Amino acid sequence: MTRLVDLGVEPFLVASSVVAVVAQRLVRLICEVSKEEYVPEAKSLSDLGVDPAKAPRLWRGRGCPDCMNSGYKGRTAIYEFLIVSDHVREQVMARASSTLIKRDAVQQGMRTLRMDGADKILKGLTTVEEVARMTQRDGF
């Protein structure tokens, strides 16, 4: 939303007309044929905001002819969905930074791309490396 203001749209127009904002990224799925369990490094998990105690084992693709030895086959989306609440509207009108808006939205329950990616890692759909490659660190 701050991008619209940066492009010259008046804040009152953005605040009154935008209902929600969606961000998505496509991440590669682990190949089901060559999928194997492994014990991840604690640091790589904590960098993504995943408690290492909750993920004693994860999955990765070993590579096979079915996935052309990449370890991945197919894609899925990770999402971030911001509902424009009255508080967010006030922040837009006050020209608050996108970092501040995002931080407050997370405190109110919004899930970031990284959080959704972490769920997909724990479900064995994708890898730590893939989510790290496609998302920014939640630095707020």
List each language-model region with its residue ranges.
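Short, flexible helix-loop junctions that flank or precede catalytic/ligand sites
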Residues: M1-F140
